[in-house]
């Protein structure tokens, strides 16, 4: 009985920890970050346009995403590539 109780406690702790560990890309080079509490979305959004036709993007964890035709807003690990 004690083993079952201990197992349930461990599973609960692991599940609670997984709920707060969203990971997002924070750079074009592939650097990642575990998002702070309250920021449950990953985002990639266009911040400027280069003369050669390319967009410059910003990658981050966020609580609310920017709107735009070239932006990505998602809620799973490493989804904002």
Swiss-Prot record:
This protein is called: Mipartoxin-1A
In the UniProt record, does the keyword Magnesium occur? no
Tell me which family the UniProt entry assigns to this protein. Belongs to the three-finger toxin family. Short-chain subfamily.
Q: What is the lineage of its organism?
A: Eukaryota, Metazoa, Chordata, Craniata, Vertebrata
Q: Which cysteines are joined by disulfide bonds?
A: 24-42, 35-61, 65-73, 74-79
Per its record, what are the GO molecular function terms?
acetylcholine receptor inhibitor activity; ion channel regulator activity; toxin activity
Q: What is its main location?
A: secreted
Q: From which source organism is this entry?
A: Micrurus mipartitus
Tissue distribution is:
Expressed by the venom gland.
Q: Which InterPro entries match?
A: Snake_toxin-like_sf
Q: What does this protein do?
A: Snake venom neurotoxin that blocks neuromuscular transmission, presenting a postsynaptic action through the nicotinic acetylcholine receptor (nAChR). Has no cytotoxic activity.
């Amino acid at each position: 009985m004690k083993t079952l109780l201990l197992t349930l406690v461990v599973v609960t702790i692991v599940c609670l920890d997984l709920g707060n560990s969203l990971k997002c890309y924070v750079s074009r080079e592939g650097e990642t970050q575990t998002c702070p509490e309250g920021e449950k979305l990953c985002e990639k959004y266009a911040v400027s346009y280069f003369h050669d036709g390319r967009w410059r993007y910003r990658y981050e964890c966020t609580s609310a995403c920017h709107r735009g035709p070239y932006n990505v807003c998602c809620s799973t690990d490493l989804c904002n590539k």
